[in-house]
Regions:
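Short, Lys/Arg-enriched N-terminal segments with co-localized hydrophobic residues
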Residues: 1-8
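Glycine-rich phosphate- or other oxyanion-binding loops that anchor nucleotides, phosphorylated ligands
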Residues: 8-10, 34-235
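Short, conserved "active-site rim" segments that organize catalytic pockets and cofactor/ligand binding
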Residues: 9-28, 50
């Protein structure tokens, strides 16, 4: 099915959890909502640009499927994914942001995955989207690191798993969707960037940090909404 085209560029904006996209949905104007494949797609305008905002659900399969729907059904020509992640570096702390310059899987055999389109072991964030994210973070007063994001289908919450991932690919943070989004975007030649705020340190305290709300999802979401809205306005 050919990608649907509209008069103006359409930007796809994704999160894995409802909290990560709800505030953005509230900011949309001229909104229509379409349930499709178990996901609600909110189409409208943000900062005068046409966007489609959705909650993909957690994990690689959900992320990949939703990315393809955004591109094929809604004609998304740029993809922004925003969410939380486990910190893997001493360069930043809880609440700081990693902008994905490089995104890859930590739980996959990369030399096999790269035998199919887009023939890559790792996926590069789009330079223009990275620049827009860096500018938006700076203007919002948010400390940001442009670096490496690792993706796998597990919540990393113990030192042994964290050390194994560090030894394998030395990422700046670890999460569950970014590489899948980036792989499908690359396969379709669609520019993409992954933004992650650090919610925990990917160790034994990670689950407690999230459960007892030491890291405020609401606070991050408000900041992320400002960052994404500023990015959209700049595109």
């Amino acid at each position: 099915m050919p990608r649907r085209k509209d008069i103006y560029m359409i930007i796809g904006i994704m999160g894995a959890m409802p909290d990560e996209v709800d505030q953005l949905c509230e900011k949309l104007e001229n909104v229509t909502v379409e349930p499709y494949g178990g996901v609600e797609y909110h189409r409208g305008t943000l900062a005068g640009k046409q966007v489609v905002v959705c909650c993909a659900g957690m994990g690689k399969a959900n992320a990949a499927a939703t990315t393809q729907v955004l591109i094929t059904r809604y004609g998304a020509e740029k993809i922004i994914f925003s969410g939380i992640a486990g910190n893997m570096t001493s360069k930043i702390g809880i609440g700081d942001v990693v902008i994905g310059k490089t995104v890859l899987y930590h739980d996959a055999q990369l030399d096999m995955i790269c035998q199919n389109p887009p023939y890559l072991k790792a996926y590069a964030g789009d330079p223009a989207l990275i620049a827009a994210a860096e500018k938006a973070c700076a203007e919002a007063g948010v400390k940001a690191l442009t670096g490496k994001i690792a993706t796998g289908d597990l919540f990393v919450g113990d030192s042994e798993t964290k050390a194994a991932i560090e030894a394998k690919c030395a990422p700046d943070c670890v999460e569950m969707e970014g590489a899948a989004v980036s792989q499908i975007a690359a396969k379709n030649d669609v520019p993409c960037v992954i933004l992650r705020a650090m919610s925990d340190n990917a160790d034994e305290d990670g689950h407690e940090v999230l459960v007892v709300k030491k890291f405020s999802i609401a606070e991050y979401v408000a900041t992320a909404t400002r960052i994404v809205a500023a990015m959209v306005e700049a595109l």
